[in-house]
Swiss-Prot record:
Record text on cofactor binding: Binds 1 [2Fe-2S] cluster per subunit.
InterPro entries in UniProt: TR_Rrf2-type_CS, Tscrpt_reg_Rrf2, Tscrpt_rep_HTH_NsrR, WH-like_DNA-bd_sf, WH_DNA-bd_sf
GO molecular function, one term: DNA-binding transcription factor activity
A Pfam family it matches: Rrf2
Cofactor(s) needed: [2Fe-2S] cluster
Designated gene of the protein: nsrR
Name this polypeptide is given: HTH-type transcriptional repressor NsrR
GO CC terms: cytosol
DNA-binding region listed in the record: 28-51
Domain HTH rrf2-type, chain residue ranges per copy: 2-129
Length: 141
């Protein structure tokens, strides 16, 4: 399983915001510069994260973006659930004639649940706490 770029960059944006001092706002442009992703793509990601309450977006001259809640309260599993389409196979009566007897979907759903359970053990704070190499990469120019 590979996360979509939407989820990947959503997590990266959250990690960047979490690495900043709490009072510091950042901008979408700053995040796109750090990660080399298109501004249009990042705008969509930040809009979704804002809608979920994970990012506060403040408009105006002194505006910007920042985490919408403390990093210790943002579980990685919750972010992935919110951003990622988690169906590994496309099972429907119309496209597959073994759907009614297939056990593969059950096994794959169990695998997804184990994956998410592991991600739920980790918060955004865990990703940045005492991570000096991360700070050096993100916060030095």
């Amino acid at each position: 399983m590979q996360l979509t770029s939407f989820t990947d960059y959503g997590l990266r944006a959250l990690i960047y915001m979490a690495s900043l001092p709490q009072s510091r706002m950042t901008s979408i442009s700053e995040v796109t510069d750090i990660y080399g992703v298109s501004r249009n793509h990042m705008v969509k990601i930040i809009n979704q994260l804002s809608h979920l309450g994970l990012v506060d977006a403040v408009r105006g001259k002194n505006g910007g973006i920042r985490l919408g809640k403390p990093a210790k309260d943002i579980r990685i599993g919750d972010v992935v659930r919110a951003l990622e389409p988690l169906s590994l196979v496309n099972c429907s009566q119309e496209s597959c004639h073994i759907t009614s007897a297939c056990r593969l979907k059950v096994v794959l759903n169990q695998a997804i649940e184990r994956f998410l359970e592991e991600l739920d053990k980790h918060t955004l704070a865990d990703m940045i706490e005492d991570n000096i190499p991360l700070y050096k990469l993100l916060l030095t120019e």
